[in-house]
Design a protein with these regions (language model features):
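N-terminal glycine-rich FAD/FM-binding segment characteristic of electron-transfer flavoproteins
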Residues: 1-340
């Protein structure tokens, strides 16, 4: 029970951004606990290509599994790799991205190891817990924090008796930061056949189609986001015009998506995308916990709302009281007149 593990996802031989974010958080947790940070990567043709990507994030030990059957991802081989590795290494904590792969792999591993898992965490901390009923005290547990009950509360979930403590985190929730470009971590090239049986390769991927992203919400310097208060699909088009004028991207709250004002791929928040733009313009957004979780680290937040007491206004740097359909056209007109 002496390490924090991060499962690193791959696209070809390139580590996914969410894994860098988790390595950064994993390094902080490991340092606080006084244990090693370990990472595991499984793919094909990755030897010699992933080490320089992963070690600079402060990884003490990198476990590399390289075999043709490990790429593209399929459930059983990767499950066998993690289960076998965790049974041998006995980690305290395992972090994964809340991605299509993480949502498939995480439950498989936690179920096999009977360890439990908390999905879509918005924060991870180390803390103690006292079980007054059973008169037990626990130290250095992983606090797995996430919105619950429809986003009305923020729950802190712990796993005191089973290991590893497993959590998934959405891309963008944590911030990726290189610790040391020359960090001297150890690399272990594992024997894949010792972990994966031939029958684990029963599923083969015959063909893959990768869609290009429809937007660049995560990388946009300016985001114009709309909520239920926008009022209609037609009014939502005004936000697109403003975003185009500002060279930004359009986003939305879950309420706006559920109302049919826009597609789900624009959703920002706990069940959508996490963004960190320099400027975030919230139009008709009330400020539910789940939405705020996806945009609270924006540089400047501007709220346009008819409700002066809307929760989003407490977070905003500037508040414009008024109807979206009246305020936004004025902003568009102003920027058209003054843009170079």
């Amino acid at each position: 029970m002496n390490s924090v593990f991060v499962y690193c996802e791959l696209e070809g031989t390139q580590i996914e951004e969410v894994s860098f974010e988790l390595l950064t958080k994993g390094r902080k947790l490991a340092s606080e606990l006084g244990v090693k940070l370990e990472a595991v990567v499984a793919g094909h043709g990755v030897k010699g290509k992933v080490e320089s990507q992963i070690l600079p994030y402060g990884v003490d030990i990198l476990h590399v599994f390289d075999a043709p059957g490990l790429s593209p991802y399929t459930t059983r081989p990767h499950t066998a790799v993690l289960v076998g590795l965790f049974e041998r290494e006995q980690p305290q904590i395992c972090l994964m991205g809340a991605t299509a792969i993480g949502r498939d792999l995480g439950p498989r591993v936690s179920s096999t190891l009977t360890s439990g898992l908390t999905a879509d965490c918005t924060a991870l901390e180390i803390g103690d817990y006292e079980d007054k009923k059973n008169k037990k005290s626990y130290e250095n547990l992983l606090y797995q924090i996430r919105p619950a009950f429809g986003g009305n509360i923020v729950a802190t979930i712990i796993n005191p008796d089973h290991r590893p403590q497993m959590a998934t985190v959405r891309s963008g929730v944590m911030k990726a930061e290189v610790l040391d470009e020359n960090y001297a971590g150890q690399v272990v090239y594992e024997d894949v056949d010792a972990f994966v049986k031939p029958e684990d390769y029963v599923v083969q991927v015959l063909e893959r189609h990768v869609e290009k992203a429809k937007n660049n919400l995560k990388g946009a310097p300016i985001v114009v986001a709309g909520g239920y208060g926008v009022g209609s699909k037609e009014n939502f088009d005004l936000l697109r015009q403003l975003a185009e004028e500002l060279h930004g991207e359009v986003g939305a709250s879950r309420a706006a998506v559920d109302a049919g004002f826009c597609d789900h791929d624009l959703q920002i928040g706990q069940t959508g995308v996490t963004v960190r733009p320099k400027v975030f313009i919230a139009c008709g957004i009330s400020g539910a916990i789940q939405h705020v979780a996806g945009m609270k680290e924006s540089g400047i937040i501007i709220s346009i709302n008819t409700d002066a007491k809307a929760p989003i206004n407490e977070l905003a740097d500037y508040v414009i009281e008024g109807k979206v359909e009246e305020v936004v056209p004025k902003l568009i007109k102003f920027y058209k007149a003054h843009s170079k």
